Amino acid sequence: MTDSEYLAKNYLTADPSPPTDRPKKKRKKTKAAEVESQGLIIADDDPPDLRSTATLSSKENDEYGPVVTGARSAEFRKTKKSNWKTIGSSTNTGTDTATATGPNAGRDEADAILADAMAEEDARRAAGDEDPMVVDQDDNEDDGGLRMESGARAGLQTAEQTAAMVAAQQKKRKAEEAQYKGKQGHAQETIYRDASGRIINVAMKRAEARRLEEEKLIKEAEAKEALMGDVQRAERESRRAALEEAKVMPLARTADDEELNEELKAQTRWNDPAAQFLTKSTGGGRSKTGKPLYKGAFQPNRYGIRPGHRWDGVDRSNGFEKEWFAARNKKERMQALEYEWQMDE
């Protein structure tokens, strides 16, 4: 007797099949069916060296060996009744059965559930859990829901909630109106924001722009100062000193002004024909910067700067000063000729 036949005989029950008049067809038995009735053998396909010690068949752990599963019989598949038995006290089982199988058992159970629900509802109402909650929000706070023009939120609301929202909206409007009335409205400043939404401090930005503009002007002045020579700086300082002295001078200066006469006599002109008749040296042989000057002849320049005492007399310039004087003299000569031709005509 096989294991499946033993289990079917002692532990499985099945209802007898109803008698039918149709003759049953005989199925041909195959070798595969015989193997299925005998059972299936489940074994690992892994090589022996990869198997764990728990899967190896030995005397200590025979339970991990190949498992033989019995095939399900036809009687077990046809059964409609559960053979499980409930183990427990007979008193509780009998009471529960009597309660559940009474004629009004369903109605009593529904009434009990409704009574419990009503009791819980009364308890919540007594505790005030479902009362309308009125929350005082700030002017800047908003719940994000849709609101009507009156201030009430869209959707189903209780009368208390609607009244509270309308009152809050009116309070907010009054506060905004009071803010823009009187001096407060004139004292408000425009708030500027950048692309990310951060507030821009306009006063700080303006101060920064002014500082950058001042630095730019200072750099331009320093660049111009670097292009100037020592003589030009000295002349600028002398003009500044003259302007300071002019503040206390009289408005009219006559030919008898000694200071003006001395200043004009001290000037050196390269084309002065009467300079050779002077018996007193006015230049002193030194420049305005205090350095000694060259005493020989030199090519004139447009700034009137004399060469230093160490000059060897060789003109190493690119000839611009000579061409500048030649162009200027040519222009003056042409103007004089045009005037003479006009007078002759």
Curated annotation (Swiss-Prot):
UniProt xrefs under InterPro entries: Bud13, CWC26_splicing_factor
Coiled-coil intervals, chain numbering: 157-244
Any one cellular-component term (Gene Ontology): cytoplasm
GO biological process, alphabetically ordered: mRNA splicing, via spliceosome
Amino acid composition bias (Low complexity), ranges on this chain: 91-105
Chief site of localization: cytoplasm
Signal peptide: none
Highest taxon, organism lineage: Eukaryota
Locations listed in the record: Cytoplasm; Nucleus
Protein name: Pre-mRNA-splicing factor cwc26
Species this protein is from: Emericella nidulans (strain FGSC A4 / ATCC 38163 / CBS 112.46 / NRRL 194 / M139)
Lineage of the organism: Eukaryota, Fungi, Dikarya, Ascomycota, Pezizomycotina
Gene: cwc26
